[in-house]
């Protein structure tokens, strides 16, 4: 596979970030929370659907119990997102750095967070698990996990010779975890005590909100203030901070208050207001993610199709957490650029349009869940507002498009690098005569294998595996036959190393379908060749798991009944290693298929008593010698003698 280092904007930063355990853990932890984001998003949609008749009905049906039940689901899903993030990020970090004790990481992080966020003697309020506390939760979780791992590693090294053989493993792990857990918990307890003595608030996001309110009180709500407001609210998502919540006080007490004061005074509404941002700068939610979804749809990339399907309906109502954490935007140095840029450009275009009189100002407050086009008309009282939204939508989609290309190119490059490492590991195992275990190793390796396995399964189902034929030439330079080969060209990783594809299929229970697909394609093409009057020999490699399958012979016989080969021959090549490793059912099933016209060859035949005995007890039409035997046949008399002996057998 050709490896080319593409010049991609943000590539170095992205590569560095993807090499850090804590950043990988944050991303994967947030991904694990997506089902709860989806459930919570639909609950918000059900309770905030911007139709007055519906709102009256949902609050009155069953005496309001349906509405209450929806709120219960919301509070248990989206309303508890910080709790989920603490557990999933700590679990992901533990899985990234070691394969055991993930529970200790999770519980230690949760207890540390609960200690840090307590206030006074009242204990813990459930509100500390809402989205506004998510950044604080992630920060405490990462620090707790890193400290826990550091202390545990040092402590484990210190006591490694103090345990005797036979000690229960779970008990030993628990004892080893006591000191690290204690250190982490008391570290946060001491820090919380110091902050309490200093009178410092523990919610980092709230601290930032207070400082920003004072800042905007000085800057004002003009063009500079509006640009800074949007920049800060969008860039904060890169760090996992809910930008809209962090600047909620600024948007309501400054920008929205300016609109209500103008309406009350009977003067012209200001250009910039909370309604202006919701209608013209945040189409589909933060970052104008409806534009992002449109760009994804237009590119028709299979990889992003699931994200589009899951995110499009909520985004129509400006609910976009699914997209923010699914793409993701969080900790993504490539996608954060258009995420910030699109709202700023849309704000500039909308402000100029209002300033020169093309569109009336957004002087009527509308619900933030009101869909595009409707919100433009209702807020301005003019169809011009809807037309402006459509123009801004096109502009935003256009800006997102090239950044999606960059992001995909970077993802493809990372996958290529990981696949190349996997290939190198497999080749090293082959040289040692070992079989690679694809399900063990680093987290990156296991995730790469999961990705390739999923893609291979889809490729088999969709018939995307290519069939190639390698000619077999006689000593007289004539074509004796062909060997059927399946080759997988991955859409991102490129040409896949064939033995690695076989191992992926074998270790993930895909080999039966993979092998039968090759046999059927070979049979179909052999029938075409026979009709052209070419009596060729078609060879197909067979692996152990296929012969061990109880349905293998039935499926092969069904294929043989479907196609007719005339003077051509279908041959199954069985490797010597496979023949010696399989159970006693193999000869019986070989005989069954021989009666149906299948010819058997032994492939990669070597030496040894077991090999010779197997050759003696089974009827093979031909033997393909292993390369180690024929490599020196011209200049080594012993090799010549051995091969002559095999020929006589």
What residue spans do the PLM features occupy?
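Catalytic core of bacterial c-di-GMP phosphodiesterases, primarily the EAL and HD-GYP domains
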Residues: 510-585
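Signature for phosphate-centric chemistry
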Residues: 490, 501, 526, 540, ...
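Transmembrane alpha-helical segments and their short flanking loops
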Residues: 2-17, 56-61, 263-269, 324-429
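Early transmembrane hairpin of solute transport permeases
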Residues: 15-159, 330, 344
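The catalytic core of metal-dependent phosphodiesterases that act on cyclic dinucleotides
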Residues: 559-633, 647-649
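Helix-loop-helix junctions within the multi-pass membrane cores of secondary transporters/permeases
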Residues: 6, 10-15, 255-339
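Active-site core of bacterial EAL-family cyclic-dinucleotide phosphodiesterase domains
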Residues: 433-504, 602
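Cytosolic juxtamembrane amphipathic/interface segments immediately preceding
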Residues: 7-29, 66-67, 163-175, 322-324
């Amino acid at each position: 596979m050709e490896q080319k280092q593409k010049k991609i904007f943000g590539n170095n930063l992205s590569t560095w970030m993807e090499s850090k355990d804590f950043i990988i853990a944050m991303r994967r932890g947030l991904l694990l929370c997506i089902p709860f984001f989806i459930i919570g998003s639909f609950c918000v949609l059900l309770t905030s659907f911007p139709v007055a008749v519906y709102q009256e009905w949902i609050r009155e049906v069953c005496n309001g119990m349906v509405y209450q039940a929806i709120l219960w689901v919301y509070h248990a899903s989206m309303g508890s997102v910080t709790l989920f993030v603490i557990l999933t990020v700590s679990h992901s970090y533990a899985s990234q750095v070691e394969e055991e004790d993930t529970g200790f990481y999770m519980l230690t992080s949760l207890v540390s967070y609960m200690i840090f966020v307590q206030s006074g003697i009242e204990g813990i309020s459930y509100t500390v698990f809402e989205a506004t506390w998510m950044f604080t939760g992630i920060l405490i979780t990462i620090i707790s996990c890193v400290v826990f791992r550091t202390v545990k590693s040092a402590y484990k090294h210190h006591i490694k010779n103090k345990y005797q053989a036979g000690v229960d493993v779970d008990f030993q792990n628990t004892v080893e975890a006591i000191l690290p857990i204690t250190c982490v918990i008391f570290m946060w307890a001491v820090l919380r005590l110091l902050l309490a003595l200093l009178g410092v608030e523990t919610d980092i996001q709230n601290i930032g909100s207070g400082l920003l309110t004072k800042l905007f009180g000085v800057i004002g709500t003009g063009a500079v203030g509006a640009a800074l407001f949007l920049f800060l609210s969008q860039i904060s998502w890169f760090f996992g901070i809910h930008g809209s919540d962090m600047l909620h006080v600024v948007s309501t007490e400054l920008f929205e208050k300016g609109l209500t004061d103008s309406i009350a005074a009977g003067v012209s509404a200001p250009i910039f207001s909370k309604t202006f941002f919701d209608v013209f700068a945040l189409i589909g939610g933060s970052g104008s993610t409806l534009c992002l979804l449109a760009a994804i749809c237009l590119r028709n990339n299979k990889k992003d199709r699931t994200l589009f399907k899951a995110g499009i309906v909520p985004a129509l109502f400006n609910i976009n957490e699914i997209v923010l954490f699914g793409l993701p935007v969080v900790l993504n140095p490539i996608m954060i650029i258009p995420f910030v840029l699109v709202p700023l450009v849309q704000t500039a275009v909308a402000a100029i349009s209002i300033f020169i009189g093309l569109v009336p100002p957004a002087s009527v407050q509308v619900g933030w869940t009101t869909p595009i086009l409707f919100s433009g008309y209702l807020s301005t009282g003019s169809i011009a507002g809807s037309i402006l939204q459509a123009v801004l939508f096109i502009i935003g989609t256009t800006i997102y498009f090239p950044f999606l290309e960059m992001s995909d190119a970077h993802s493809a490059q990372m996958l290529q690098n990981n696949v190349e490492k996997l290939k190198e590991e497999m080749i090293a195992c082959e040289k040692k005569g070992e079989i690679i275990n694809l399900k063990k190793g680093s987290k990156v390796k296991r995730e790469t294998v999961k990705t390739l396995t999923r893609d291979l399964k889809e490729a088999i189902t969709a018939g995307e595996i290519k069939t190639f034929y390698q000619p077999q030439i006689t000593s007289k330079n004539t074509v004796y036959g062909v060997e059927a080969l399946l080759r997988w060209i991955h859409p991102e990783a490129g040409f896949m190393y064939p033995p690695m594809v076989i191992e992926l299929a074998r270790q993930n229970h895909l080999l039966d379908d993979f092998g039968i697909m090759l046999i059927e394609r070979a049979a179909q093409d052999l029938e075409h060749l026979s009709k052209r009057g070419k009596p060729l020999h078609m060879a197909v490699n067979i692996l152990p798991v296929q012969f061990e399958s109880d349905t293998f012979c039935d499926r092969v016989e069904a294929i043989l009944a479907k196609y007719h080969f005339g003077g051509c021959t279908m041959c199954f090549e069985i490797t010597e290693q496979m023949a010696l490793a399989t159970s006693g059912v193999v000869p019986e099933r070989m005989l069954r298929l021989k009666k149906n016209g299948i010819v058997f060859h032994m492939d990669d035949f070597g030496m040894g008593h077991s090999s010779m005995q197997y050759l003696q007890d089974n009827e093979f039409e031909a033997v393909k010698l292993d390369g180690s035997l024929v490599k020196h046949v011209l200049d080594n008399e012993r090799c010549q003698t051995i091969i002559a002996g095999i020929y006589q057998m």
